[in-house]
């Protein structure tokens, strides 16, 4: 049985199946199975650690290889195809991935460990054929252009080739530095007004220049604003990721945040996803923060960071600023229910 595991709970389910059915061989790949190095007979995960006191079942193999690598054929060499299960209503929305590559070219954010992906299993699509346009489904098709963070090269090559149809929406993650903004502008100009439904996700994290530098983002608040002005000019939808849980905020960061939010163009951001910092194993923040360990069975996925009362107050003030400007700048704040538990 071959399983593609996106989240650790999928991996845990495969682990439980392997224990329950020892006569069946289970092979698990997918995003959560990614490896730091490729060692024969050993799994070297990036996103989780396995309890040292637990031995995984012998009939469970976890691998960072792609399906093509596993079966020994060139990546992206086959015909891309997606069969929709018959019990899914024909007019419903479906969401699927179209992989461009499997790493982040930036590699410097302190809370992320995508940079650790083993080079031996790097894969990159050479031809953007957009085969997903032929999926046999009448409803809305939401296509994730899957990368760690889309490269300037793919911005210029992939975006102008996307079919523009009312039944196709696209999602992608982009850095908001000057190089990426220029590449995005080049692609949008090349489309000459024939722009499909694009939703761009980007990591705003904490928009003060001091905190952006600390987090390893590699851009400034000025570059962020340039990116947002461009997206608004072309009518793109923006999902901004805003991160809290920092243990080093100062009053100047709050003033810088308010200055940024005041300067942000109205109606530029559609949604703001508020997240509390998660320290993954092997990420740099894992060694500089503390928190209660998160386990799913024998799989350790890090911890939600704990901060002292003074830092909780500063993080709470930052959240209040974002909420206040959501009404002024007309964007929806998401994630409030889950994040409040960490501020008590």
Roles of regions detected by a PLM:
Residues 179-180, 247-257:
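Active-site glycine- and acidic-residue-rich loops that bind
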Residues 2-129:
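Acidic, low-complexity intrinsically disordered segments
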Residues 39-59, 190-202, 256-279:
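Structural recognition of alpha->loop->beta junctions
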Residues 16, 217-223, 255-257:
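Charged helix-capping and loop-helix junction motifs
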Residues 252-344:
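C-terminal accessory regions of radical SAM enzymes
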Residues 30-36, 244-247, 278:
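Short beta-alpha junction loops
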Residues 2, 23-27, 125, 129-239, ...:
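Conserved SAM/AdoMet-binding glycine-rich loop
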């Amino acid at each position: 049985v071959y399983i593609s595991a996106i989240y650790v709970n999928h991996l845990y389910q495969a682990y439980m199946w392997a224990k329950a059915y020892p006569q069946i061989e289970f092979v698990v790949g997918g995003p959560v199975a990614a490896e730091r190095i490729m060692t024969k007979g050993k799994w070297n995960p990036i996103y989780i650690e396995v309890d040292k006191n637990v031995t995984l079942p012998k009939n469970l193999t976890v691998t960072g290889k792609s399906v093509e690598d596993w079966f020994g054929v060139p990546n992206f060499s086959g015909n891309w195809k997606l069969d929709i299960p018959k019990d899914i209503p024909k007019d419903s929305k479906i969401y699927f991935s179209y992989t461009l590559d499997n790493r982040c070219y930036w590699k410097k954010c302190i809370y992320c460990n995508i940079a650790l992906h083993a080079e031996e299993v790097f894969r990159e699509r050479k031809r953007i054929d957009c085969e997903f346009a032929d999926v046999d489904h009448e409803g809305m098709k939401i296509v994730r252009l899957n990368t760690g963070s889309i490269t300037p090269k793919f911005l210029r090559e992939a975006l102008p080739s996307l079919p523009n149809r009312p039944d196709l929406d696209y999602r992608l993650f982009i850095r908001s530095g000057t190089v990426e903004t220029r590449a995005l502008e080049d692609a949008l100009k090349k489309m000459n007004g024939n722009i499909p439904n694009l939703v761009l996700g980007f990591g705003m994290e904490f928009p003060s220049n001091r905190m952006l530098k600390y987090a390893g983002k590699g851009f400034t608040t000025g570059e962020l604003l340039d990116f947002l002005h461009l997206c608004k000019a072309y009518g793109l939808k923006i999902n901004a990721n805003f991160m809290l849980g920092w243990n080093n905020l100062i009053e100047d960061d709050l003033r810088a945040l308010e200055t940024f939010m005041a300067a942000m163009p109205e109606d530029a951001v559609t949604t703001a996803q508020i997240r509390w910092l998660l320290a993954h194993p092997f990420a740099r923040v894992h060694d500089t923060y503390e928190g209660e360990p998160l386990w799913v069975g024998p799989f350790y996925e890090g911890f939600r960071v704990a901060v002292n009362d003074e830092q909780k107050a500063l993080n709470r003030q930052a959240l209040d600023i974002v909420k206040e400007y959501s009404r002024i700048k007309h964007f929806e704040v998401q994630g409030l229910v889950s994040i409040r538990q960490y501020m008590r």
